[in-house]
């Protein structure tokens, strides 16, 4: 994984809010965070391997009380700024009627290399 991404995951974990990569099987009570990196795992190109150099990252914060928005956003944005510099932006703020939670999403870009593993040779 790109270093900026792993640093961001650590920084988000340090906010004091539960944080998971790619979602939760059972949603935590209270405020929680979800972070994810978008890339095409296992895709093969060219000489048998694909190397991407930049990746989209998303951070989602979920919380029950609108009054918590400033505190949550402040901690998440501080983590984003320290790990991604200026390569992020606020994407959306919404209230989800199904869960009753407020949801803020930030998106950004991280740089690095993820090399897809080569396909196994021979018959499996």
Model region roles, listed by residue range:
Residues 37-57, 111-124:
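Long, continuous compositionally biased terminal/linker segments
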Residues 51-65, 100-113:
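Oligomerization/assembly interface segments of phage tail-like spikes and tubes
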Residues 74-124:
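Acidic-leaning, charged glycine-interspersed low-complexity segments
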Residues 1-46, 67, 72-75, 98:
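Small/polar-rich, solvent-exposed N-terminal microdomains that initiate assembly or binding
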Residues 17, 55, 86:
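Residue-level signal for beta-strand positions within conserved beta-sheet cores that form or flank
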């Amino acid at each position: 994984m790109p270093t900026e991404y792993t640093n961001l995951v650590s920084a988000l974990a340090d906010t004091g809010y539960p944080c998971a990569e790619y979602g939760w099987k059972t949603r935590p009570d209270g405020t929680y965070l979800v972070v994810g990196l978008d890339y095409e795992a296992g895709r093969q190109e060219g000489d048998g391997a694909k190397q991407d150099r930049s990746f989209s990252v998303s951070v989602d914060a979920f919380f029950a009380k609108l009054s918590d928005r400033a505190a949550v956003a402040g901690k998440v944005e501080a983590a984003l700024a320290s790990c991604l510099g200026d390569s992020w932006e606020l994407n959306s703020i919404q209230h989800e009627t199904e869960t009753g939670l407020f949801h803020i999403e930030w998106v950004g870009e991280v740089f690095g290399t993820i090399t897809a593993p080569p396909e196994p040779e021979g018959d499996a």
